[in-house]
Amino acid sequence: FREIKGYEYQLYVYASDKLFRADISEDYKTRGRKLLRFNGPVPPP
């Protein structure tokens, strides 16, 4: 997927044999991704 810094984009994470939608925000200051919220019972990374 394309990394868009400063913008929020949807990321589909495959976990527990099920597909959950997660909203991920790219933060270029910390050079990482900040998890906003998970739509589903997804265990923490």
UniProtKB/Swiss-Prot annotation:
Pfam families for this protein: Monellin
Use in biotech settings: Natural monellin has not been mass marketed to the food industry, primarily due to the challenge of large-scale purification of the protein which is relatively sensitive to heat or acid treatment.
Keywords recorded for this protein, A-Z: Taste-modifying protein
Source domain of life: Eukaryota
Assembly description: Heterodimer of an A chain and a B chain.
Known function: Taste-modifying protein; intensely sweet-tasting protein.
Protein name: Monellin chain A
